[in-house]
């Protein structure tokens, strides 16, 4: 495609109402978080902001940071405009290499998928904070800024504007949070400070959901329980019994707890990793999947490699495209999206759950998932996004009375918490339709 003549107003004319609202707010604030939902067009809005700042002589240099999958989108977007702006790209994974060097200065820094910075103690988060302090303007882009708890906002706003919540987490926690969870190592909003916290979030950000910005078909989440039987049930109960005392011990090592949860999940899926991979005779989850598996295109997400290989063998009569961290051709997903060559997209949750457009399918199955609300939400939106024309069905398989059931309960709570901060407070301030 031939590049358009550089024309900020022409670019602004291409923005829809919500995108233009985000643009105007960013121009007023200077630095801001854009928390537009998947499909909102955050890249296009940030590009318009960049071009306008350049056209008015406010910036000359730009640094765009993000994961590799997000950075690949930007050159294509910017190639549409013949603008002599100097743009540098930084993969978050390369940030640690900058620890011991003098950091350069940029006029504008954009942190794409800013939720990757939520760990305030990570090298990536600290490097972006240091870079941001030298920049005149800063933008943070994320459709899922809150993955686990409200503390996820601190590092993102520390990058955008340290004056919002301050640069010290202890002061931030004292002002807005209460300790909770195991050994009080987690944080939740102090109910007395909830409205103040939410008002500050929305004062320095722009939020819109896909339901508000797009015309999408309905989505239905189906919880699909099954009973765990036979040798799998015996193995599960034995492992719980053996580790019961450790679970009740407040001094339990966090790594041990994570390992235990993982092994219990594996048993629910019909296998367990040990010195060798042990496959159980009772494959209840596989049997449940086969009962609900549609004949049309379907996306299946798994947490473990063994699950992918197990389903690959079971679904040998289907046309399967496997997508994992070992997949060399990262563009092969397009053959599922754009052709009828494959009817099953079988993917690792971490690898295939972000950055892919899979809306040629309207059915998605979570064979397994973890506690990360961010991973779950991002994976769900591979099929529920701009361009989807059919009603979407999401199926979540879990063994009743096991760790899998509690995982979905935790995801529900995390989703409610994120919605409370991002949407409920904002929506109650909007004029009510009569």
Regions of interest found by a model, annotated:
Residues 1-2, 13, 28-31, 37-41, ...:
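Conserved Helicase C-terminal RecA-like lobe
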Residues 112-113:
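Walker B catalytic acidic pair
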Residues 96-100, 147-150, 306-312, 330-333, ...:
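SF2 helicase motor core recognition
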Residues 92-108, 119, 130:
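Conserved helix/coil segment N-terminal to the catalytic DExD/H
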Residues 1-32, 76, 80-87, 91-93, ...:
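Charged, low-complexity
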Residues 371-434:
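A conserved SF2-helicase RecA2
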Residues 69-87, 160-163, 317:
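Conserved helix-turn-beta segment of the N-terminal RecA-like "Helicase ATP-binding" lobe
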Residues 61, 108, 125-212, 388-391:
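Conserved P-loop NTPase motor "coupling/switch" region that bridges the ATPase
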């Amino acid at each position: 495609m031939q590049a358009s003549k550089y024309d900020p107003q022409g670019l602004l004319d291409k923005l829809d109402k919500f995108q233009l609202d985000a643009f105007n707010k960013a121009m007023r604030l200077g630095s801001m978080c854009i928390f537009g939902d998947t499909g909102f067009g955050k890249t296009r809005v940030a590009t318009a902001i960049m071009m306008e700042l350049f056209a008015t002589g406010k910036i000359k240099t730009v640094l765009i940071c993000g994961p590799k999958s997000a950075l690949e989108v930007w050159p294509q977007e910017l190639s549409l405009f013949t603008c002599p702006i100097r743009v540098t790209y930084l993969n978050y994974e390369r940030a640690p290499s900058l620890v011991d060097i003098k950091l350069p200065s940029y006029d504008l820094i954009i942190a794409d998928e800013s939720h990757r910075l939520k760990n305030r103690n990570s090298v990536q988060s600290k490097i972006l904070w240091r870079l941001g302090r030298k920049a005149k303007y800063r933008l943070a882009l994320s459709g899922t800024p809150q993955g686990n708890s409200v503390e996820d906002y601190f590092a993102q706003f520390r990058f955008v504007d340290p004056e919002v919540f301050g640069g010290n987490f202890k002061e931030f926690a004292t002002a807005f949070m209460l300790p909770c969870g195991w050994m009080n190592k987690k944080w939740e909003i102090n109910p007395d400070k909830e409205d103040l916290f939410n008002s500050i979030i929305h004062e320095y950000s722009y939020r819109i959901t896909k339901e508000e910005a797009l015309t999408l078909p309905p989505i239905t989440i189906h919880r699909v329980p099954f009973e765990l039987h036979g040798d799998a049930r015996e193995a599960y109960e034995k492992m719980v019994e053996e580790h019961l005392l450790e679970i009740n011990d407040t001094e339990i090592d966090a790594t041990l707890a994570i390992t235990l949860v993982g092994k219990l999940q594996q048993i629910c899926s019909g296998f367990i990793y040990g010195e060798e991979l042990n496959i159980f005779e009772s494959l209840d989850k596989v049997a449940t999947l086969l009962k609900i598996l549609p004949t049309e295109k379907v996306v299946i997400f798994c947490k473990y490699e063994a699950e992918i290989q197990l389903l690959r063998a079971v679904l040998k009569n289907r046309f399967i495209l496997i997508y994992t961290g070992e997949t060399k051709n990262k563009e092969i997903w397009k053959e599922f999206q754009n052709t009828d060559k494959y009817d099953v997209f079988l993917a690792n949750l971490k690898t295939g759950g972000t950055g892919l457009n899979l809306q040629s399918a309207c059915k998605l199955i979570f064979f397994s998932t973890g506690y990360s609300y961010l991973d779950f939400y991002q994976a769900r939106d591979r099929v529920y996004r701009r361009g989807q024309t059919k009603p979407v069905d999401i199926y979540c398989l879990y063994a009743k009375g096991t760790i899998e059931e509690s995982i979905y309960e935790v995801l529900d709570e995390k989703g409610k918490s994120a919605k409370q901060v991002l949407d409920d407070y904002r929506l109650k301030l909007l004029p009510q339709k009569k």
